[in-house]
Structure formats: C-alpha cells, structure tokens
C-alpha cells in the first residue's frame, strides 16, 4: 500500500541499531510501494515476486523475507488493522465503555478518511475487489481482528475461559468495522468522492452504535483506578 514515509532526519546521534531499523523500514516501504505500483498497472495476479524484486532492486528472497505472503505486499497495515480495535479498548478512559471508545474511533476514522476503514482511491479499491486472493486475505484480517478484540474484552471483563459474551460483543463491534470498510470500498469503486463517503459513513456509524447501545452500552466499562 502506498503510505507516505515519515520525514527522515539527519540526526547523527541516532544509535547504530536505530539506523539499521530505519534502513529495514525503508527497504520494506520500497518493496511495498514498488509492488503496489506494478499491481495497479498490470493486476495483482499478473505480477510475480521475481518481477517485484527486479523492479525494487532487491533479491527475491528479500521480498519474501519482508512479505511471506504476496497479498501482504498490498495489505501492509496488518498489525494496525487487526490489532487496532483491541488497542482502542485497552487504552480507553476510566468510566468509558468499549462501545463508546470504538464509536469515537470509528467517527474519527471516517472524518480523517483513514485507510483502516477503506479509504484508498479508486484504482486501489478496484485492485482489492478484482482479486479473489486479496478479498480472501482481507477476510482473514477481519477474522483475526475480531479474535483479538474478543480476547481483549474477555480480559477487561474478567470472563471465564470459554465465556461466549466477549466473542459475541467482538463480532458485533467488529462487524460494524467490516461493514464500514466494505461500504467505503464499494462507493470508491463507483466513483463517489472521499468527502461524500465520509459523510455517509458518519451517519452509518451513529445509526449502528445507537442500535448496539441497549445491549452493549454498559458492557466492558473501564473502572476508575
């Protein structure tokens, strides 16, 4: 995915380990950006790992070391995407429910036109929808995100092993995210502007969370410390 690199500084006080890590990040970003450009030009299924390596000026093994799965060359926000909801719940304020924290986060993501809820541009959106492999990988992302959210909710509510409630809550809360993501991509492919999509999503988010409020409004409220 084409994500702008953060500004790099010429700070000579950076430790050697920091320089190595920065170099790794630059290499990773170069590979991902190069691959995405090739995929946009020729289609996901028509580009090989070897061709990506040549275009990025790295060894084929370097590509697979950074991205063991070809799909992740495109979907390179794995940790942010799958762990984001659990992190929001974990970091919410005292007195705040999981429902309220996630509602605020979804509203902010829609307002900021965040890639995590599907904003990407028409070419990239078509790339996602045209490839069964990418559709399948996105489904895995959604499923993993719900598992991580369920585990966090279970920990927050001191649930017994095998308790079903955290899984149901995670499915409902994660399901809103899945629906928002799919709606954003669909509307983007159809040519709707990001601003218009953002406004529509805001309405959907409020509607969805008002529907969930009676059942989850008092669930997983962060106790005061």
How should each PLM-predicted stretch be described?
Residues 1-11, 151, 182, 186-225:
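C-terminal peripheral helix-coil segments that are non-catalytic and often amphipathic
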Residues 76, 83-124:
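Hydrophobic alpha-helical connector segments
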Residues 58-67:
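Short hydrophobic/aromatic patch on the recognition helix
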Residues 132-158, 164-168:
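Amphipathic alpha-helical packing segments from all-alpha helical-bundle domains
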Residues 1-58, 75, 84:
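Basic, helix-initiating cap at the start of DNA-binding domains
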Residues 177-178:
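Alpha-helical transmembrane segments of multipass membrane proteins
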Residues 26, 72-81, 141-142:
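Alpha-helical DNA-contacting segments of helix-turn-helix folds
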Residues 31, 35, 52, 122-123, ...:
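Polytopic alpha-helical membrane proteins, predominantly small-molecule transporters/carriers
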